[in-house]
Amino acid sequence: MVLGKVKKIPVEEPRLTKEQKIERDLLIKKKVSKLANSIRIPPAIYQFRTVLSEHDTKKFVELFMKYRPENKQEKRIRLQSEDPKKGPKPILVKFGLKHVTNLIETKKAKLVLISASVDPIEVVIFLPTLCRKMGVSYAIVENSTLLGKLVNLKTTSCVCLCDVRPEDEGSFKEMLRTADAIFLDNYETHLSTWGGLPQKEADEKQ
């Protein structure tokens, strides 16, 4: 023991029950929501409030599910076959922030889905601007869990498709038009629209 140094007694934090954890999480969400509506939200962040409708999201997910990567069991079966690399290279959904960013920068990505529920949102805040710069179609969806299901993960921040099979080209072009009409064509509007406080109150606070 060092003279003059106070010995710290470890304090055990109380273990919360499942109900207490749910109550705590709800309280945090309420505080975040209250804060979000009491300050001005910059356009770069507020643009993530514009998401695909439930109907459009369902159509996008159905197409992306056709190109979902193989899971562990499917991979094991493939590797046990006589020639695992036999056949053409499969068209699959690409995921992972760095990988998707690289595909956008090289203009290989054709449609990017970005999650609006990423925390912190700063992780993906640059993606819409990057897509606009490179001329890549993008859409924002409400839930990162939904995107995770497309690639056999719990959650993921973004996914993209670089190509589709000939039989899906018609529906894919329709989805590109839908995504562009909501996001790419309205990029300037989204990047000039502030959120949070009503405009009058925000101007008064300034």
From Swiss-Prot:
Oligomeric form and interacting partners: Component of the large ribosomal subunit.
Family that this chain belongs to: Belongs to the eukaryotic ribosomal protein eL8 family.
Localization of this protein: Cytoplasm
Organism: Encephalitozoon cuniculi (strain GB-M1)
Pfam families membership: Ribosomal_L7Ae
Single GO term (MF): RNA binding
Gene3D superfamilies linked to this entry: 3.30.1330.30
Name of the protein in question: Large ribosomal subunit protein eL8
Statement: the UniProt record of this protein carries the keyword Transferase: no
Keywords of the record: Cytoplasm, Ribonucleoprotein, Ribosomal protein
